[in-house]
Curated annotation (Swiss-Prot):
It comes from the Eukaryota. It comes from Homo sapiens. Keywords: Chromosomal rearrangement. It holds the Pfam family DUF4704. This is Putative protein BCL8. Expressed in prostate and testis. It is linked to A chromosomal aberration involving BCL8 has been observed in diffuse large cell lymphoma (DLCL). Translocation t(14;15)(q32;q11-q13). The BCL8/IgH translocation leaves the coding region of BCL8 intact, but may have pathogenic effects due to alterations in the expression level of BCL8.
Length: 100
């Protein structure tokens, strides 16, 4: 599906949970880092056209997960290409969403 065809109906909370579950699965594999990098780079982080059309609750779930759980995984530092920006953004999101 092209990103320009994305719609609110395509990305729901169950779809997000599948992405996050897949990210956790890949993180646990010894050979999963390249696929996790692709998932992060092309779906979870660098493609705002996907997430801008989703309901606010789905966006909140994604950013809460990113600021609370995802940033603590062992392979995160070697997986994400724009680590400085992501960590900085997650720190801001943590303050905004979680109050600390």
């Amino acid at each position: 599906m092209s990103c320009c065809l994305s719609s609110r109906v395509h990305i729901t909370r169950p779809v997000l949970e599948q992405f996050l579950s897949f990210a956790k699965y890949l993180d646990g594999l010894s050979h999963g880092v390249p696929l996790l990098k692709q998932l992060c780079d092309h779906i979870l982080f660098i493609n705002p056209a996907i997430w801008i059309h989703t309901p606010a609750k789905v966006q909140l779930s994604l950013y809460t997960y990113l600021s609370a759980e995802f940033i603590g995984t062992a392979t995160i530092y070697t997986t994400i290409c724009r680590i400085g920006t992501v960590i900085k953004d997650n720190a801001h999101l943590k303050i905004l969403l979680l109050g600390y």
